[in-house]
């Protein structure tokens, strides 16, 4: 029943907006993810070195350093102070996500999101209803565990099992242990629990959620008085608990939780255009 309701809600959105408009933010997001992965892959596979490095640490055109601040924090926990250029790269990333929202990384950049979205899509198509409940705070414990492991081992612990790094290496060097981890993430989301990895376990998402909690760019239920209670936004959202205060509350219409990935899926799904992307009140929705 639940899956048929999801399909009906999506069909209503497509009927109201048309196929392209009902997938506008999804299309932009997927294009951004593919482009991000593509620039990292272009060097090793085609000799086009726009970016050298990986999602953890890289350099754009040999000039602009970028470093994952979560990696930098783990490095500090090992007792090693990262090089100045690495700290600069981490600071640039933090500043960027303070503007666009920390977990925008999850929805717009992270290639593993493509894996988990595919698992969710297939889950619906196959009618899989099993949904083992996990506390979403578990990812905070995994985050703390990664930092503690780095402190105790003197190594950047999360990189040994980081699905993002393992996926990139697997695409370049072929099959290996990395694909086992990616398969485990896929099967978790497909067979065990809805949005299990991104929504409940990933420490990188937990970290960026903390970073971007006060970010400028937000989704808003700007026209919540027009809500028809179809439930499409809740069904499609990777973090549905973030919607309720903005949509059903009496205070701010902004979705203020750091868990929001600013993906725009609720904007796409809503047949009556309740939601919009805003920057402290100024609409930045694409046209």
Curated annotation (Swiss-Prot):
Q: Write down the SUPFAM superfamilies for this protein, in alphabetical order.
A: 4Fe-4S ferredoxins
What InterPro entries has UniProt attached to this entry?
4Fe4S_Fe-S-bd (IPR017896), 4Fe4S_Fe_S_CS (IPR017900), Electron_Trans/Redox (IPR051684), NapH_MauN (IPR011886)
- Name one molecular function that GO assigns to this entry: 4 iron, 4 sulfur cluster binding
Q: Which GO terms describe its cellular component?
A: plasma membrane
* Lineage: superkingdom: Bacteria
Pfam family name, one: Fer4_7
Q: Where does [4Fe-4S] cluster 1 bind?
A: 227, 230, 233, 270
Sequence ranges assigned to domain 4Fe-4S ferredoxin-type in this UniProt record: 218-248, 251-280
Pathway annotation: One-carbon metabolism; methylamine degradation
Which keywords has UniProt assigned to this entry? 4Fe-4S, Electron transport, Iron, Iron-sulfur, Metal-binding, Repeat, Transport
Q: Which residues bind [4Fe-4S] cluster 2?
A: 237, 260, 263, 266
User: Which PANTHER family would you find in this protein's record?
Assistant: FERREDOXIN-TYPE PROTEIN NAPH
What is the annotated role of this protein in its UniProt record? Involved in electron transfer.
Provide the protein name. Methylamine utilization ferredoxin-type protein MauN
Which species does this protein come from?
A: Methylorubrum extorquens (strain ATCC 14718 / DSM 1338 / JCM 2805 / NCIMB 9133 / AM1)
Q: Which gene encodes it?
A: mauN
């Amino acid at each position: 029943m639940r899956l048929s309701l999801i399909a009906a809600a999506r069909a209503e959105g497509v009927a109201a907006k048309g196929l392209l408009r009902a997938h506008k933010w999804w299309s932009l997001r997927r294009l951004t993810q593919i482009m991000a992965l593509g620039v990292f892959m272009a060097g090793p596979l085609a000799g086009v070195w726009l970016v050298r490095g990986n999602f953890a640490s890289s350099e754009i055109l040999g000039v602009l350093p970028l470093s994952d601040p979560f990696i930098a924090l783990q490095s500090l926990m090992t007792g090693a102070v990262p090089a100045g250029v690495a700290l600069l790269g981490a600071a640039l990333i933090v500043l960027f996500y303070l503007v666009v929202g920390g977990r925008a990384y999850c929805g717009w950049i992270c290639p593993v999101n493509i894996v988990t979205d595919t698992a969710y899509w297939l889950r619906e198509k196959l009618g899989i209803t099993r949904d083992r409940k996990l506390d979403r705070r578990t990812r905070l414990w995994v985050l703390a565990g990664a930092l503690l492991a780095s402190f105790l081992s003197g190594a950047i612990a999360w990189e040994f099992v980081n699905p993002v790094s393992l996926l990139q290496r697997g695409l370049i060097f072929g099959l290996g242990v990395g694909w086992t981890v990616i398969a485990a993430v896929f099967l978790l989301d497909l067979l065990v629990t809805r949005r299990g990895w991104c929504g409940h376990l990933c420490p990188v998402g937990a970290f960026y959620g903390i970073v971007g909690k006060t970010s400028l760019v937000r989704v808003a239920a700007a026209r919540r008085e027009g809500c028809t209670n179809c439930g499409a936004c809740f069904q499609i959202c990777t973090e549905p608990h973030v919607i309720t205060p903005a949509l059903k509350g009496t205070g701010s219409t902004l979705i203020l939780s750091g868990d929001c990935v600013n993906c725009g899926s609720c904007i796409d799904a809503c047949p009556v255009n309740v939601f919009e992307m805003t920057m402290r009140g100024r609409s930045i929705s694409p046209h």
